[in-house]
Amino acid sequence: MGYYSLTEITAVQYAKDHGYFEAKANVVCHEIGDGNLNYVFKLDDGEKSIIIKQALPYAKVVGESWPLSIKRATIESKALQIFAQYVPDYVPAVYSHDEELAITVIEDLSRLTITRKGLIGGEEYPLLSQHIGRFLAHVLFYTSDFGLQSEEKRVLEGTFVNPDLCKITEDLVFTDPFGHYDTNDYEPDLQLVVDELWSDKTLKLKVAQYKYKFLTRKETLIHGDLHTGSIFSSPSETKVIDPEFATYGPFGFDIGQFIANLLLNALSREEEKRSVLFFHIEKTWSYFVETFTKLWIGEGVEVYTKEKQWLPIILQNIFTDAVGFAGCELIRRTIGLAHVADLDEIENKETRIQAKKQALSLGKELIKYESKSADIQLFRTLFQQTVSGGVKA
């Protein structure tokens, strides 16, 4: 039959045909996706529920003028299954994958809340940083040359060649926000600040280096889009979703993206309500380092992991990259194609514009920063130096 796009009606029929529900079951189906690239359906018969996710052959946010390969659905499914090998508690269960229709049937996580939405609403998620730090340490270690035999890593790397989605990252994170491109999207009130950013040659030289790292450093399997909208949370659970951007890339990329999105939420808050975000930023790194170090010592397969002075060098390199990647993410989420609700939903226009100017300034500082030690307090320090006051209540 070939590929076709599901509707709420055909999604129910697909689920019944594949044994998820009885033929006579009264299944309620709603399209719940709010992302840019896929359809997401929730199906529930009152006793059990599932999620059906289908990749579209184009970017939903733009339309059919932006074609995309549906093979990204297979990459996403494989990534979730690999993550589950190392950190099953931190990803949804994958029930099945249909490569022809680009459909993945996965666990319903409706008991949880999208982390971005929860943080905007004032939730604190006390275990978020512990869970994400450990998730990152396990996945990044075990899919790298440190935790995987080199020949196995090369085979795995080949299964995550993801040109369409990598091109989106190359353009929307590292290129378009730093020049005159049609994809950019920002308020006219930001034009002077944007012009200054675009004319900053020192900044562009640093961004060029971070883009080159993303293009060339195939160090480990990265999620590729690890922001707070790609995580479900509750006070006791954390689940990472949507790794359709998964590819082999730099160790620091996912860490930087996650931290940047916590910073974006901090920018949207009153000053006295920001401390929980810095707690999570700092604890994410400390849990990552603690877990990565244990794995390095106990599970390392690369012979030189026995050299005691190498691990600090690796961690310093990861941290340096994370700082720069965080800066790029701050800028692209402020003036690029895909914004974040943390800033866009600030009701007062003057306050919103000020927060976005601060995001751009902080992004520039992070990109330009020359870190000499892996001091996670850096994010708090640069934030305080760059941002004065907070959003007014």
UniProtKB/Swiss-Prot annotation:
Positions contributing to substrate binding: 225, 332
What UniProt keywords are attached to this protein's entry? Amino-acid biosynthesis, ATP-binding, Kinase, Methionine biosynthesis, Nucleotide-binding, Transferase
Give the Enzyme Commission number: 2.7.1.100
Which regions form coiled coils?
none
Instruction: Identify a single GO molecular function assigned to this protein.
Output: S-methyl-5-thioribose kinase activity
Binding residue positions for ATP: 38, 53, 107-109, 242-244
Reactions that this protein is recorded to catalyse = 5-(methylsulfanyl)-D-ribose + ATP = 5-(methylsulfanyl)-alpha-D-ribose 1-phosphate + ADP + H(+)
Q: Which GO terms describe its biological process?
A: L-methionine salvage from methylthioadenosine
Signal sequence: where?
none
Its annotated pathway reads: Amino-acid biosynthesis; L-methionine biosynthesis via salvage pathway; S-methyl-5-thio-alpha-D-ribose 1-phosphate from S-methyl-5'-thioadenosine (hydrolase route): step 2/2
What EC class does the entry list? transferase
Subunit structure and binding partners: Homodimer.
| Family indicated by similarity | Belongs to the methylthioribose kinase family.
Q: What is this protein's function per UniProt?
A: Catalyzes the phosphorylation of methylthioribose into methylthioribose-1-phosphate.
Q: What is this protein called?
A: Methylthioribose kinase
Organism expressing this protein natively: Bacillus cereus (strain G9842)
Q: Which gene encodes it?
A: mtnK
